[in-house]
């Protein structure tokens, strides 16, 4: 069974890949520090932070920060295009995560633009807060004898 953060990333990547707006995007599993213009547009899904709080002796809440980053080239309207991307990303992420029975809300959106050669490049980062209630992590039961 995959770790829950791995499942979040895979679920969101798959949902974004299925949406027509992002058909020409490269969806990265790892967000590199720099991306060349030939690779754009790109999307990345990251889970950089997870907070665990023990609710009871048998229950914890896992609050995970999930980020979706999009980078695309454009002209002076690149931020407007990213704003339109953000509406769709929010809807896709909410549908995918909530459809899996996990609490999800958009916490923050940031857009940064700069110039790469003669083109403008914009980066959108959307931060979602996901909450999962689950049992604390345990080790597998090793009481079964192993056969050599």
What are these regions (language model features)?
Residues 1-35, 47-148:
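Charged, amphipathic alpha-helical segments and their flanking helix caps
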